[in-house]
Each structure stands twice: as structure tokens, then as C-alpha cells.
């Protein structure tokens, strides 16, 4: 018997880290939970990384995802930003690995193509389509929408269910 695939998408950031949990079954995705962690940039980086790790641990324990999905880094404003973002991504990837959760990564172009149908779509178009695809009535923060978008992208890239065994 088929059961839904539960996907946890993460949009890593040094100021805000977005997350989105969806279930995908028989070609349809359903919103389970989403939000973002707003980090105080005045706090030392190790403290912010710990907060991301603890939040992700709690999300994994609560939602029991079958896989984790993260957007690949493609641009940084400065070398320092790239290094900090690399640390954040490392924490996210490590938490998935600690829990034995398979990790998948997609480029921004792949995500925009999967969600909007155009690889150079605007952020507002992605946000709009995420709300439509998930039949989500409320507003979504940008980081939250990005995390849901990467989760939906993965749902479109893999078989939509797993066999219970």
C-alpha cells in the first residue's frame, strides 16, 4: 500500500532560515507546516548555528520527514557572506545526516523551473505558485515560501509515493 512522502525543505540563511514540510501523494502536495527562524545577527555565529541546529532537530523529531531538501548556493554578496552561508548549510546538512535522512539539493533555476515553469522567474512568481500548488490561503514569508518551493521541487522530481513494507 502506498503512503505519502513527507519532505522537509530548508532555505538556509544567516539572518533567516526558512523551513517547509509537505506531504506528497498521488501527484498532489499538501502543506503540513512552515515558517522561518529569525536570527539575531548581533549574536556570535556559533550561537546562531546552534539555534539553527536545535530548531532543525525539533522539526525533524516532530514531523519525521522521509527526506530533506536544500537549495544549492549560487550567489553571495561577498566572500564573508558565502562563508557564513556555507556554515549554515553545513549545520543543516549535518542535522539531516545525524538523523539518517536522505538529502537532496536543487539549484535556484531548477526550483523556479519546477514551480513556475520558467528558470528565470521572479521571487514573487515563485511565492504565488507555491500558494496555488499547496492551496495555501495565508501569507508566506519569502524564506518560508522558498523552503516550500524546494520541497515541492523534490516532490516533482521523485516518484510520488513509497511502498509500505
Predicted regions and their residues:
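Phosphate- and other anionic-substrate recognition elements at nucleic-acid/protein interfaces
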Residues: 1-165
